Amino acid sequence: MALQLGLFLIWAGVSVFLQLDPVNGDQDEGVSTEPTQDGPAELPEDEECVFPFVYRNRKHFDCTVHGSLFPWCSLDADYVGRWKYCAQRDYAKCVFPFIYGGKKYETCTKIGSMWMSWCSLSPNYDKDRAWKYC
């Protein structure tokens, strides 16, 4: 029983840290975009995230954990292997004005939300459905 429990705990621990679909898994061989302790290889820290960006045919309006254990963003509108982990300053900002329900909003709103104010991450929420709490 103890041996089975020990094997399960080892398996569970490995599973938590195993990243099956790395962010840069579709890159050409010989091109290094692996992160180092200082951040992604050969990328200055001051480069800004580009929103929205397309990764694997999906449009992202904010930092994502798609294919990663930690939030990241692309440095290009179409992901081509240039990326960085998101710091607090990197997350997408509200876009004003934005359209919601055919109406223009200049500030965060509680309309459509039960408790908290929110804003759109694109000029047209009705089209993109991208939002965050304010």
Swiss-Prot record:
Arranged from A to Z, the UniProt key words for this protein are: Disulfide bond, Fertilization, Glycoprotein, Repeat, Secreted, Signal
Q: List the disulfide bonds.
A: 49-73, 63-86, 94-119, 108-134
Q: In which tissues is it expressed?
A: Major component of seminal plasma.
The record's SUPFAM superfamilies line, in alphabetical order, gives:
Kringle-like
GO terms for biological process, alphabetical: phospholipid efflux; positive regulation of sperm capacitation; single fertilization; sperm capacitation
Quaternary structure note: Homodimer.
What protein does this entry describe?
Seminal plasma protein PDC-109
Q: Which organism is it from?
A: Bos taurus (Bovine)
